Curated annotation (Swiss-Prot):
Biological process annotations from GO: intracellular phosphate ion homeostasis; negative regulation of phosphate metabolic process; negative regulation of phosphate transmembrane transport; phosphate ion transport
Entry's family note: Belongs to the PhoU family.
Name of the featured protein: Phosphate-specific transport system accessory protein PhoU homolog
Major localization listed first in the record, in broad terms: cytoplasm
Protein's organism: Deinococcus radiodurans (strain ATCC 13939 / DSM 20539 / JCM 16871 / CCUG 27074 / LMG 4051 / NBRC 15346 / NCIMB 9279 / VKM B-1422 / R1)
Purpose: Plays a role in the regulation of phosphate uptake.
Localisation per UniProt entry: Cytoplasm
Length: 213
């Protein structure tokens, strides 16, 4: 029975890693839509998001089967709980990346209000966070999980800078308001992706250490 449980745990862990990997694949495509006006790539982002949704449903069913069949305890139970609780976070990451791509496609229909320097930095940082998060989960690496949390603070700071800049643009010329508000929404979507990554990172830490401190 122990061997069967370990095999099932490896399978759902790999599934969660693959689900995170799918979101990670979405980020550069959404970046192309937003930063390089590649509205033609919006369909690819949506297609990847559908993969994320399907992965979520499959993993949720598998986690529930493991609980019913094996009744795991201690670290094994914490792993199943980590994955179950993180599925909605990862699914929401995908949704927010789709929102970024959709807004990017709409923004591409008119001249840019400004260069999207900080949005580009946010996207780059989120890609690093995702890579770091997957490694922390695969290797049970608390340090990488904590680094993911720290990187989210940088994403939050970039979002705050974007807000300040865009408020200035709106005050200077009311004609900028519509586009500035959409850019704020893009920034907010990216900030939320980081928040959901942080949630998963905190659960990885608890899984490994058994402590919430």
């Amino acid at each position: 029975m122990r061997e069967a449980l370990e095999a099932d745990l490896r399978a759902v862990l790999n599934g969660a890693l693959n689900m995170l990997g799918t979101v990670e694949r979405m980020l550069p495509v959404a970046a192309e839509v937003l930063l390089h006006e590649r509205a033609d790539l919006l369909g690819e982002v949506r297609s990847l998001d559908r993969e994320v949704d399907a992965q979520e449903a499959q993993l949720e069913a598998e986690c529930l089967r493991i609980i019913a069949l094996h009744q795991p305890v201690a670290r094994d139970l914490r792993l199943v709980a980590l994955i179950l609780k993180s599925l909605s976070d990862i699914e929401r990451m995908g949704d927010y990346v789709v929102h970024v791509a959709e807004d990017g496609a709409e923004l591409a229909q008119a001249p840019a209000l400004k260069k999207y320097v900080n949005l580009s930095r946010m996207l780059s940082r989120l890609t690093e966070m995702s890579q770091n998060l997957r490694t922390s989960l695969a290797d049970r690496d608390v340090t990488r999980a904590e680094n993911t949390t720290r990187m989210d603070d940088e994403v939050d700071e970039l979002y705050e800078q974007i807000q300040r800049e865009l408020v200035t643009y709106m005050l200077e010329d009311p004609r900028n308001i519509s586009k500035a508000l959409m850019l704020m929404r893009v920034g907010r979507s990216l900030e939320r992706v980081g928040d959901h990554m942080e949630n998963v990172a905190e659960r990885v830490r608890y899984w490994v250490t058994g402590s919430r401190e």
